Regions:
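Sec/Tat signal peptide C-region and signal peptidase I cleavage site
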Residues: 18-23
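Bacterial N-terminal signal peptides
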Residues: 9-17
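Bacterial N-terminal signal peptides that target proteins for export
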Residues: 1-9
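Primary mode marks residue(s) on the alpha4-beta5-alpha5 output face of response regulator receiver
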Residues: 24-374
Length: 374
């Protein structure tokens, strides 16, 4: 009888362990939903108890970790580089701190060297399970950044995002919590909707109106518009009143581009070299050398560039955040290409050329009248 009881106890223990394991597996699967596929399998999963102590469900095998859906319906993921900061925040919250008091305590911890500041350009991922908020949102933290310096819009896209066609926009500029909101349209967990039809951009004959199409509405009226003659000389079609400069469509490439005005000298150099008959490879090499020598000043870290293309064989509406010399692991960013998904109208942002002076975050814009169709 004693032996039978021992066997039954052991079996019950195995069943309980199996049940806990299955529960943890379900929690892990749910927690990684905000991430792109290439980060999910090795992302860490954790939570906090009522005392603010960390509970680990799966150790991180890459540079991202996720917290399961909370009582407010949010599932979040972020860089493992910010773990110490989040752990401290959880303990302070458990002690009753919130709002300004909590932020002040974190700032004091930064000054004391107890936690690192939020890295410039670090990524945060959020999923929400109802349609009254943005359901899939990625955020790039840009502490103390100002929209005009980075060439960003501050016009809220919340309503457009709920309709499946929101554009990125900056919030809380000039503060320690400044960030770029990137609503993700077009995926299976995004808000439903999107533009009902595409805009016939080729029918737009006004060169200034066409040149500013890649921009959000609030930046278009104030952007400079330029072109180049056959000898590579700059022609100003409209002076600018913000940080953005747009170039009319390049008939050879089909691209219409807008960028931070600090890149003007670089585009001037490229135009001159192209007019001299240099190949693209030679132009890129010359520009690279000029950057290294300091002849060309790089654009601010985090600044945006905007590109429109009007055929279906490439990303039609693409925004690019410049992150010179940044590494994906430091910022919690993915590097898996989303080109094919973007052509289908459901691409996610991804980093390219990490660790180089031309490192950048590709931000395909889905769901708008200028975007690739599903």
């Amino acid at each position: 009888m004693k032996r039978i009881s021992s066997v039954l106890f052991a079996v019950a223990g195995l069943c309980m362990a199996s049940a806990i394991s299955l529960a943890d597996e379900a929690k892990i699967a749910q927690a990684v939903t905000p991430l792109p596929e290439d980060l999910r399998a090795e992302a860490g999963v954790y939570d906090y108890d009522d005392n603010g102590e960390r509970l680990t469900y799966r150790e991180a095998g890459n540079h991202v970790e996720c917290q399961p859906r909370d009582e407010n319906g949010f599932t979040t993921c972020t860089s493992t580089a910010t773990a110490a900061r989040r752990d401290l925040s959880a303990k302070l919250s458990a002690e009753g701190l919130s709002g300004g008091e909590l932020q002040a305590a974190l700032a004091s911890a930064e000054e004391a060297g107890e936690v690192d500041p939020m890295p410039m350009g670090s990524m945060f991922y959020r999923a929400y399970d109802k349609d009254d908020r943005i359901q899939l949102l990625w955020v790039v933290f840009l502490p103390d950044a100002v929209s005009d310096v980075l060439g960003m819009s501050t016009l809220s896209q919340r309503d457009n995002s709920l309709a499946g066609k929101g554009l990125p926009w900056m919030m809380r500029e000039g503060t320690g919590s400044a960030h770029l909101m990137i609503p993700i349209n077009g995926t299976e967990i995004s808000n439903l909707g999107g533009a009902s039809m595409s805009l016939d951009t080729k029918a737009i004959e006004d060169p200034i109106k066409h040149a500013t199409l890649p921009l959000p509405e609030d930046l278009r009226p104030y952007a400079a518009v330029i072109d180049y003659d056959d000898e590579g000389n700059r022609k100003v079609l409209r002076p600018g009143r913000n940080a953005i400069e747009c170039r009319v469509r390049d008939e050879q490439t089909g691209f219409t581009r807008c960028y931070h005005r600090s890149l003007g000298a670089e585009t001037d150099m490229q135009a001159k070299l192209m007019a001299e008959g240099k190949t693209m490879q030679e132009v890129f090499a010359a520009v690279g050398e000029a950057r290294e020598s300091g002849e060309l000043t790089p654009p601010p870290l985090g600044s945006l560039a905007y590109r429109l293309y009007e055929e279906d064989d490439r990303l039609k509406l693409l925004w690019v955040m410049r992150l010179p010399n940044a590494m994906a692991a430091d910022l919690g960013m993915p590097t898996g290409s989303q080109r094919d998904a973007s052509l289908e109208g459901k691409g996610l942002p991804w980093m390219m050329r990490e660790g180089t002076s031309s490192a950048h975050l590709m931000i395909p814009i889905n769901g708008t009248e200028l975007s690739n169709s599903k």
